[in-house]
Amino acid sequence: MSNDKIINAYPDIRLMYLSLIGMVLCVSLTAQQTLSLGRNNYNQDKGIIFQKESGVNARIYTNGFSFGYQLGKIKKYNLSQYYFAEFGELKDPIESRQQKNISLSGPRGTFRGFIFGKQNNFYPLRVGVGEKRFLSEKGKRKGLAVGVSYEGGPTLGLLKPYYLILRHTSDNPGNFTSIRSERYSDENAPRFLNWDDIFGADKLTKGLDELGIVPGINIKGSLHFDWGAYGEFIRSAEIGLMADAFIRDVPILADNDILGINNNQNIFLNFFVNLRLGKRK
């Protein structure tokens, strides 16, 4: 090949190289922009990484239950940080529901079961922040990922008076008997804590206009099992230990030395199981 032909071929070769470099740059810029937007961020080893996740929780613990919501940000493929809020009921460990087979003609009919000695229902509203770390990896879309979760924050405890339907016997001749709905007090303690005078519990909404407040804090730690750790949909379960601490004793049961009821406390420890469903995006 002559020198003239070789020299004349250089522009074509340079043009090919420039075109190839331009194509590579375009693909690189497009990929970088796509990753920066958090889309198609797929790693062969770590799975699909999203930016945010949200879900609902159903938690059962030793002495109560709660329902909640989580909203979080995915920091890394194995690390998420989130905010949470949950509302439920916290019971005294020695509570026992009882039932009397009593029925009356009229609007009341059969009476509801009751908890002997109960003074208040206690409903904690827990909020706070948490973190979830995965300790194991799984296949791209299948398998089980195991991790740990820990969270904590303030608690607003709501006390609702517990009402019983009590029997009142008149001192007049004929011993006329009436029934009344009453909450616990020092004055009616002998009747409130007398099995024979109790017909049953009043409706659950009774006392909602008499709520009291007990502030506190909450912390939880758990093992986390996720069947969709790197997928779009969240299906996970947790088992762990939770603690609630309040600024004063919570009067769930009526203190009574005669009956041996002196169990009110300000710190509650519970084992729990939590189920969570949600979505990542």
Where do the PLM segments sit?
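Residues that define the transmembrane beta-barrel architecture of outer-membrane proteins
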Residues: 50-54, 61-65, 79-81, 121-125, ...
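Membrane-embedded beta-strand positions of outer-membrane beta-barrel proteins
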Residues: 56-58, 69, 83-87, 127, ...
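Transmembrane beta-strands of outer-membrane beta-barrel pores
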Residues: 60-64, 73, 87-93, 131-135, ...
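Short loop/turn motifs that connect adjacent beta-strands in outer-membrane beta-barrel proteins
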Residues: 46-52, 74-81, 92, 119-120, ...
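Cleavable N-terminal export/targeting peptides
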Residues: 1-47, 281
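Short glycine/proline- and aromatic-enriched beta-strand/turn motifs that initiate or cap beta-hairpins
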Residues: 32-87
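Outer-membrane beta-barrel transmembrane domain signature
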Residues: 151-238, 242-264, 277, 281
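Outer-membrane beta-barrel translocator/channel fold
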Residues: 86-126, 130-141
